[in-house]
Amino acid sequence: MLQVNHERVAKLLQGLAAFTDSEEGVTRLAYSPLDKKAQSWLLEQVQNLHLQIRTDAVGNVFLRRDGKQPQLPPVASGSHLDTVIHGGAYDGMCGVVGALEAL
């Protein structure tokens, strides 16, 4: 059964929430320098997971971990790090961090 590391999840969520342009909520617009910094920070945090990392032409990041049974189809999860202006602290980030925790 999956064991959630609450400290790791909190660290990632708090760390990502710090990349904001506003004091109210979280503002990290897509493709902004702050968005790119948040993405780089997150990739630094997951280096020890030994994932295959690929970025496409528009900046989407794909993290892959090979399964123990390669004949089975892959499981995929998608989310985003950017936010709307004054967005919620967990908008998008929860999906990213949740998927990482499942790995």
Labelled PLM ranges:
Residues 69, 84, 91:
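Glycine-/small-residue-rich active-site loops that bind phosphorylated ligands and cofactors
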Residues 3, 28-30, 80-83, 89:
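Residue-level preference for alpha-helix termini and adjacent loops
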Residues 23, 73-86:
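Glycine/charged-rich beta-loop-alpha catalytic/anionic-binding loops adjacent to active sites
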Residues 9-13, 70-77:
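Short coil-to-beta-strand
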Residues 11, 15, 41-45, 98-101:
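Alpha-helical scaffold segments in soluble metabolic enzymes
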Residues 3-33:
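N-terminal capping segment at the start of a domain
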Residues 22-66:
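A non-catalytic alpha/beta surface segment that caps or lines the substrate-entry region
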Residues 77, 87-103:
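Alpha-helical metal-binding/catalytic segments enriched in His/Glu/Asp
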